[in-house]
């Protein structure tokens, strides 16, 4: 049962509130809390000069600022602390604050708790953004007033009073956001699971545990959608508290969605033929099947079909850039894990020239090497993980007794130049890093945009 937002308004008024992080996504939250009558202090590691005009803007509305390297040392004495998702709750500063009586939460937890609209939550290792967007587009096509947020779109908590019971909200949720969650969306999906973010999570078990929070607090009339082709997610059916629908690319599924004789079906009803889908790759057929399961109760087959046959994809996801001298360039900068890169490689009909490497999330690259060695013509590596990926591939090349040229480069510009020089007419060059971007870029979008700019200048 959803709580009325008036309870939160009564609770937060006059409270001493700390908001950790003054990034773009937290700024609407800070301003909203001030509007609700809270006494807000905003914390950030950056100094005033780095933050720019936002520091003055916040001070003008009465927000106190705690800035600099040791900013978390001053979390004592607050009634409520809104933490940024990527910060672990077991940090000593948070543990101490909680022991002193602080209520530690996050924007997303409070949003799901009080949102009057029906909430669709999507998580998983790969396919989250595309599936979130597909669900959003299908609901919108059906005529619902639909909001999208979480890891994509805009922060929604500040707009909660505009939302109605007959609205729909679609959220992409990361393991970081879910780790401390004690509330679940009414309709939840786990797309798939593979090792990821092990630079933040203690181990893979903790990562999986965090993902399960998306359905752990559901009720009997809620829905959980699971991937039947993924052993980990398929086995979660036994832990479900409500209804379960499954999707599969390889098995017939009657209580869910599947690919049968090249037809995409939901509950035995045909939606469309796979040849009519604009999205590239089998992994995107899986994303569509998952979306069908989520919206089945609310959306007509016609609306599902329209989106499935017209939606051409989200930027930075197997995105075709251009063809130059018979060479095709694709931007798959979203691929920040080996499994996502492997899915991208599988969407091409021939071996490609792959540009990969980046920030080290402490995840193994052996599965990428073993599953992808025969799908790569030339491997161009950059970033912190370049030698780690090279080592994984060299082992596979050695015992498979196959050949693959591996080139180490120091920049995106050099990577594209090398790829372009080595490519022949008919080749495909794709940026699909298998790693996060943080060693060289603030995010995957900026990484992808630089790649596109370089390719477009060829």
Swiss-Prot record:
- GO-annotated cellular components: cytoplasm
Identify this protein by name: UDP-N-acetylmuramoylalanine--D-glutamate ligase
Q: Where in the cell is it found?
A: Cytoplasm
GO MF, any single term: UDP-N-acetylmuramoylalanine-D-glutamate ligase activity
Q: Which domain of life is it from?
A: Bacteria
Annotated ATP binding sites: 124-130
Q: What is its EC number?
A: 6.3.2.9
Q: Does the keyword Zinc apply?
A: no
What PANTHER family does the entry give? UDP-N-ACETYLMURAMOYLALANINE--D-GLUTAMATE LIGASE (PTHR43692:SF1)
What's the family?
A: Belongs to the MurCDEF family.
Q: Does the UniProt entry include the keyword Protein biosynthesis?
A: no
Q: What does this protein do?
A: Cell wall formation. Catalyzes the addition of glutamate to the nucleotide precursor UDP-N-acetylmuramoyl-L-alanine (UMA).
Q: Which organism is it from?
A: Clostridium botulinum (strain Hall / ATCC 3502 / NCTC 13319 / Type A)
Q: Which InterPro entries match?
A: Mur-like_cat_sf, Mur_ligase_C, Mur_ligase_C_dom_sf, Mur_ligase_cen, MurD
What pathway annotation does it carry? Answer: Cell wall biogenesis; peptidoglycan biosynthesis
Tell me the name of the encoding gene: murD
Q: Which UniProt keywords are listed?
A: ATP-binding, Cell cycle, Cell division, Cell shape, Cell wall biogenesis/degradation, Cytoplasm, Ligase, Nucleotide-binding, Peptidoglycan synthesis
Catalytic activity annotated for this protein? Answer: UDP-N-acetyl-alpha-D-muramoyl-L-alanine + D-glutamate + ATP = UDP-N-acetyl-alpha-D-muramoyl-L-alanyl-D-glutamate + ADP + phosphate + H(+)
* GO terms classed as biological process: cell division; cell wall organization; peptidoglycan biosynthetic process; regulation of cell shape
């Amino acid at each position: 049962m959803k709580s009325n937002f008036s309870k939160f308004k009564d609770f937060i008024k006059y409270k001493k509130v700390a908001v950790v992080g003054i990034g773009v996504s937290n700024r609407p939250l800070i301003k909203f809390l001030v509007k609700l009558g809270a006494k807000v202090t905003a914390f950030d590691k950056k100094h005033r000069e780095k933050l720019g005009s936002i520091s003055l803007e916040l001070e003008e509305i009465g927000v106190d600022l705690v800035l600099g390297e040791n900013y978390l040392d001053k979390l004592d004495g607050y009634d409520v602390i809104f933490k940024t998702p990527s910060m672990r709750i077991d940090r000593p500063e948070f543990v101490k604050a909680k022991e002193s009586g602080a209520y530690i939460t996050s924007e997303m937890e409070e949003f799901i708790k009080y949102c009057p609209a029906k909430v669709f939550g999507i998580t998983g290792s790969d396919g989250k953004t595309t599936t979130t967007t597909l669900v959003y587009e299908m609901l919108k096509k059906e005529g619902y007033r639909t909001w999208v947020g979480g890891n994509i779109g805009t922060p929604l908590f500040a707009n909660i009073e505009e939302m109605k019971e007959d609205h729909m909200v679609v959220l992409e949720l990361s393991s970081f956001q879910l780790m401390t969650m004690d509330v679940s969306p009414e309709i939840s999906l786990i797309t798939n699971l593979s090792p990821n973010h092990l630079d933040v999570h203690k181990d893979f078990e903790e990562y999986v545990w965090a993902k399960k929070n998306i359905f752990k607090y559901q009720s009997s009339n809620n829905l959980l959608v699971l991937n039947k082709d993924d052993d980990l997610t398929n086995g979660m059916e036994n832990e479900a508290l409500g209804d379960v629908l499954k999707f599969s690319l390889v098995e017939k599924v009657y209580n869910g969605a599947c690919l049968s004789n090249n037809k995409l079906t939901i509950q035995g009803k045909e939606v469309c033929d796979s040849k009519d889908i604009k999205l590239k790759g089998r992994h995107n057929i899986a994303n569509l099947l998952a979306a069908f399961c989520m919206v089945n109760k609310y959306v007509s087959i016609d609306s599902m079909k329209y989106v499935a046959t017209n939606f051409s994809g989200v930027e930075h996801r197997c995105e075709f850039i251009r063809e130059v001298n018979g060479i095709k360039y694709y931007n798959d900068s979203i691929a920040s894990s080996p499994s996502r890169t492997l899915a991208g490689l599988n969407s091409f009909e021939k071996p490609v020239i792959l540009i990969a490497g980046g920030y080290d999330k402490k995840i193994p690259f052996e599965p990428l090497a073993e599953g992808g060695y025969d799908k790569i013509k030339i491997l161009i590596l950059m970033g912190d993980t370049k030698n780690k990926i090279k080592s994984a591939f060299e082992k596979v090349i050695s015992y498979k007794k196959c050949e693959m040229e591996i080139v180490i480069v120091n920049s995106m510009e050099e990577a594209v130049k090398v790829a372009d020089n080595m490519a022949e007419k008919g080749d495909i060059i794709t940026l699909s890093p298998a790693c996060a971007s943080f060693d060289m870029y603030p995010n995957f979008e900026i990484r992808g945009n630089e790649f596109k700019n370089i390719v477009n200048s060829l």
